[in-house]
């Protein structure tokens, strides 16, 4: 983990002296300068730890023995954690700036009243490609199966993302529980093997920027960072459908510094901070006041702030339950 900031005294919800906040977040998913700023403004030191999958984060919190005050799970994982009583119900009277969150990002199926979560970032899963290394611009998932891309495709390390684009290519739902559909998607995915160069995490950014692969299946924010570093890269969301995801701030029941957790949520809801974070990370912000502060070159880019028409073809992951999640992972 990493420590940012300086020490100071703060009163915790129990009245004991506290100067600490423990955050559990995805890697490379906040501007470090904001953590420094938070500490300078509040005197609260941040202990920052990272995870690389929702499943890893969920398992660690579920097993107990941790003291995370803030975590950043995705949509379907929030639903699961709420049902398993792993999250604190938020006191809205302690939250300032929630009204700045766009209506499209509130009241979603995984937390219908936002009783447990505050929108942080949102985005899509799509195809990043190198214009100098592809003969034809990929527009559809089926394009990945072209023999032109033998040993030229990087896949994000996520079972639902990888199986998901195979399901989408066949016209099936990302949340299907139909075993026939899943087996057909598995068979089709297996036929992609000759084209797969590697299944990777954050390392994909370096490989794509360096031109080590022609195509990558990844998240929109990761693609944004790649595009900033290599002018030959482009990003597309296939028109037949893909994943629309949401990552939210939550307070796990492992919380030891609840007052500090609310202070952090309010800090991140400030438009100037949310805008700075969005520009640094490259993901789309649900904070409309923050979006207004961003350059139009960012907010007008339909690859990263897609149109309503595109969004209608996208699906949010449902919480499949342990049995079906296991089946997806096994495939």
Predicted regions and their residues:
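Extracytoplasmic ligand-binding site segments that recognize negatively charged/polar headgroups
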Residues: 67, 72-212
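General small-molecule cofactor/ligand-binding pocket signal
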Residues: 24, 47-49, 197-199, 234-236
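Conserved C-terminal helix/tail region of periplasmic/extracytoplasmic solute-binding proteins
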Residues: 308-331
């Amino acid at each position: 983990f990493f420590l940012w900031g300086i020490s100071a005294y703060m009163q915790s919800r129990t009245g004991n002296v506290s100067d600490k906040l423990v955050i559990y977040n995805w890697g490379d998913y906040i501007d470090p300068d904001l953590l420094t700023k938070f500490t300078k403004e509040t005197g609260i030191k941040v202990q920052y730890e990272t995870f690389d999958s929702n499943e890893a984060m969920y398992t660690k919190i579920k097993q107990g023995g941790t003291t995370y005050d803030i975590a950043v799970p995705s949509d379907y994982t929030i639903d699961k954690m709420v049902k398993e009583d792993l999250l604190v119900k938020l006191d809205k009277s302690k939250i300032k700036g929630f009204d700045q969150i766009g209506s499209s990002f509130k009241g979603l199926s995984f937390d219908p009243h936002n009783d447990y979560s505050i929108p942080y970032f949102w985005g899509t899963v799509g195809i990043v490609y190198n214009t100098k290394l592809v003969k034809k611009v990929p527009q559809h998932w089926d394009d990945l199966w072209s023999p032109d891309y033998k040993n030229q495709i990087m896949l994000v390390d996520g079972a639902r993302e990888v199986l998901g684009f195979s399901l989408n290519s066949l016209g099936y739902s990302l949340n299907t529980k139909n075993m026939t559909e899943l087996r057909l998607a598995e068979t089709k995915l297996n036929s992609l093997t000759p084209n797969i160069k590697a299944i990777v995490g954050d390392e994909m950014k370096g490989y794509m920027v360096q031109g080590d692969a022609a195509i990558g299946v990844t998240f929109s924010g990761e693609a944004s960072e790649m595009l900033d570093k290599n002018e030959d890269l482009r990003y597309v969301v296939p028109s037949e459908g893909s994943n629309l995801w949401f990552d939210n701030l939550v307070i796990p029941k492992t919380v030891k510094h609840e007052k500090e957790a609310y202070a952090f949520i309010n800090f991140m809801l400030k438009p100037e901070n949310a805008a700075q974070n969005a520009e640094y990370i490259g993901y789309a912000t649900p904070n409309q006041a923050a979006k207004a502060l961003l350059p139009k070159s960012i907010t007008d880019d339909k690859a990263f702030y897609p149109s309503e028409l595109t969004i209608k073809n996208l699906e949010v992951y449902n919480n499949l339950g342990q049995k079906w999640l296991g089946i997806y992972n096994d495939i």
